[in-house]
Amino acid sequence: MMNQTVTEEAVRRLAEGTHHDPFQILGCHAVGKKWEVRVWLPTAESASVEGWHALTRVEGTSLFIASLTEKQKKALPLHFKVNWVEANGSEHTVVSPYTFLPQLGELDLHLYAEGRHWHVYDVLGAQVKEVDNISGVQFSVWAPAASRVSVVGDFNGWNGLRHPMRTNGQSGVWELFIPGMVSGDIYKFEIRNYQTDQLLVKTDPYAKAMEFRPQTGSIVYDSTFQWQDRDWLAARAHFDWQASPINIYEVHLGSWQRDHDGFFLNYKEIAQRLVEYVKWMGYTHIELLPISEHPLDESWGYQTTGYFSPTSRFGSPDDFRYFVNYCHENGIGVFLDWVPAHFPKDEFALARFDGTALYEHEDPRRGEHQDWGTYIFNYGRNEVRNFLIANALYWLKELHIDGLRVDAVASMLYLDYSRKDGDWLPNQYGGRENIEAIEFLKTLNAEVHAQCPGALMMAEESTSWPMVSRPTWMGGLGFSMKWNMGWMNDTLDFFQQDPIYRPYHHNQLTFSQMYAYSENFILPLSHDEVVHMKHALVSKMPGDTWQKMANMRLLMGYQTLNPGKKLLFMGGEFAQWQEWSESRGLDWYLCEQPANRGVQMLVRDLNLLYQTSPALYCHDFDQEGFEWIDCHDYEQSVLSFVRISEKESLICVFNFTPVPRYDYRIGLPETGIYEEVLNSDSELYGGGNVGNSGQLTTEDQRWMNRPCSTTLVLPPLAVVVLRKKS
């Protein structure tokens, strides 16, 4: 027979896992002049309170009750312990979770509902903390369409009836403080949808760590890492990045190097090896393909399921902190690819999180990306915007990342992106612009720039959307820089042409100067160009092996000497022949081959020239740093221009044919002696050593609207760089 102090309906809802607030039943409650202790123990045979007062099972249920006098109640600790024995004889003692007050404050919930709680990662998820001098973990999750949410894990046998959570008013946020849980415990949320009764088991969207694939559990994580990069962060805040060299080495951590058995290296091991190499090569920054947790290696990290979790493939979150800290201690910045455009449909993660379209847009015409088979975030929902912006700030503030490269921005800006007529919904004005995504990006960039001094935001945006890298107060999107996809596509298309046909494609080299200063551009040669049967960079080149290598050296020079910051994907610097694969390390043995070693040494010298030549970086984003000498010699496929700074000028001359050009006359800005500071045909780089004996003297002959000129030897498929001797 049911105890009269607890209704059958309440117990039924507990048993079915549909009660929205188990605190109304469980814990210690006044009943007239007495008190009742109530606990819910689905696997217990017997139980007691504090080891001295037996609990009695309510017949036919998992509810145990003890009736206490006022005196006994006073002797009972506020947060009492429950002892119980299971059928197999195992004994357990825990502090009841149902004696604690709500831990989430009204301000937290208010800011979150408004989409302005930028440190919500310190509130939601799993927070290791002490409450009333009792240590445990505070769990909180947003699931407004749930009739019940429970914390499940090894600690309770993954039984969703053991630790049901309480709701917080109309916020949709559920919470529960569980005493005794510690960093390292594995957990998930079990969610019952209130309309369909569908039962879901989900990873924590705010989890700071996750299990190694194929396992998908969230891990309670409390960092103990001690940062040592204060000087770096202080200097970064005042860094004049627009007038400084930024040379980015794009890296996929799982395939840069592996151990002898083909397994992943740890973040700490990678840090030691990668930083040494990057410093030797002369790069200023590393850009990591996404390392937020993802289940599928083949996605390269671009289908994220754990937005706040550095992937466990390479170690713990503190191991990743070590990686970033080690880079900073060695003067290397760290950028990260970040994916707020879409997320995968894996059932254990964000997709249909509470049984409804919670993080994604409900209408598939806005909520599904047809090409990628993924969901698109609902940027019009406050809590979703908050999740993403807080995530960006988490990587920048808590993990000390120096900047984010935002993936697939074009797919966010346009409602009809990669959609046929009838497959998309216009905005409220009838247009194709995604107004909610635009406002999200502006808010994101404004908050990053305000809260993270010196952090950079970079857009992979493949259309001609205006003012991507202009401040929000000017009407721009607020990014620091934008990838110049047009330059990359035109350049690679040109280089793939047989030199016989290059005169007919000459405009592909010159056209980018028509828009080069409309944005703050990065010139990328990225991972996307060396996969999916596109071939490795050197394999794209026409001709025999010698010509392919010469073209590769020419491409490296062309990228370095053009205005714009630089990015090169790993393996390109030593002309790896194979397409990149995430399943193996790079072909480092090629660095022992003379031709590949030559390309590597050229890239190293180009990087050194770039870092030590203000003309190559001071005016990347304005026309003062660039002048054509001759952009019209399409018949011979020769280009020449000047890179300019207040301190120096560099003359850059390119020969895009395998025919050496002797006595080739170019105009020069000043009379004097010019030294040949770089020649990509040098035998040091695997070339034929055709050149100009180290220096040239001008003649008083006007040429190309210049006051003087000189004749030089242009090596085949090569670039020559000249600097006037002081």
Swiss-Prot record:
Keyword Transferase annotated: yes
EC number: 2.4.1.18
Keywords: Carbohydrate metabolism, Glycogen biosynthesis, Glycogen metabolism, Glycosyltransferase, Transferase
List of catalytic residues: 407 (nucleophile), 460 (proton donor)
Catalytic class of the enzyme: transferase
GO molecular function: 1,4-alpha-glucan branching enzyme activity; cation binding; hydrolase activity, hydrolyzing O-glycosyl compounds
Function text: Catalyzes the formation of the alpha-1,6-glucosidic linkages in glycogen by scission of a 1,4-alpha-linked oligosaccharide from growing alpha-1,4-glucan chains and the subsequent attachment of the oligosaccharide to the alpha-1,6 position.
Subunit description: Monomer.
Entry-linked HAMAP family: GlgB (MF_00685)
Name of the protein described by the UniProt record: 1,4-alpha-glucan branching enzyme GlgB
Source species: Hydrogenovibrio crunogenus (strain DSM 25203 / XCL-2)
Organism phylogeny: Bacteria, Pseudomonadati, Pseudomonadota, Gammaproteobacteria, Thiotrichales
Gene: glgB
